[in-house]
Amino acid sequence: MSYFINPVGEDRCVFLSYEGEMPAVEFSAARYEADAVLDRRHWNRLVVDVTQLQSVPTAPELFDFASGLSSNISRTRRVALVVRPEQERHARLVQEVARRGRVSLMYFLDPDQAILWVKQSSGRQIMERIGKEKL
């Protein structure tokens, strides 16, 4: 079990990557740690890479993960989930559950596309920026 949290200042983004076997409790603990880094720096971009996990998390584990995102993550946060092709079915479930909870999450098979997507401004962020410019 291991995970790495890499904050990248120029992108205002935190990269969270998992490797090996990861019990659900530790999986969530790593996400909370990454969220804390985002909160401290006032950033809203998170890229989660699970391609190096040795096993595919079960549907209930992924459901718990997505539910946790929905209840604990700021609505302005963008989360890109990078998965392997055999993880895609479960990633689709995570995306659907998170979006029902109004979390901006998308899954990707290509890490470069995930990074491009997460760096885009959301509609809400654009409106906030316009509002600040008018003041």
What does each of the following model-derived ranges do?
Residues 1-135:
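Amphipathic, Lys/Arg-enriched alpha-helical "gate/interface" segment within cytosolic domains
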